[in-house]
Amino acid sequence: TYYKKRMKAIVDCNSFYCSCERLFKPHLDDKPVVVLSNNDGCIISRSDEAKILGVEMAGPYFKAKPLIEKYGVATFSSNYNLYGDLSWRVMETLRVLVGRENVEVYSVDEAFLNLDEFAETDLQKAGLKIRATVEEWTGIKVSVGVAPTKVLSKVSNHLAKKNKLATQCVVVLDTKEKIAT
């Protein structure tokens, strides 16, 4: 059974704060990066490379500092003006792609999309187009999860992020069989 009507997507920016910092520092692409909270107390964003090294999310900076120094992890104080500006650009891109009325901003780096108007299209291709366009227009990489409900779209987004290479950062759960697995 295919779910063709009432499809939802969530577009989630990948390691958003780190991605924003890298956008203006391209020499950090493929290098470990972390962003710290206000007053540099905790780690609030980690690049995939920092995750692989074992840098913990929300961990106190002073505890992670030896690991960060050992591996030369690029470390940034949070820059909320930059993140807000790039968030706005990502959300505006989504509004252009699916219509303003079909975008529900969920957080600074996430938005739900109503894909009812796209029900007859290939949702995998639509997700790939959304991902590619956001990256092309803003420089920010995103993952896209598509499913009949918001909760399932969050699950599909998690699956997309879990294996970025195989999924191309897009997973569509549009059948009972896909949802069951």
Show the residue positions of the predicted features:
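Gly/Gly-Pro- and Ser/Thr-rich, intrinsically disordered tail segments characteristic of DNA damage-repair
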Residues: 2-181
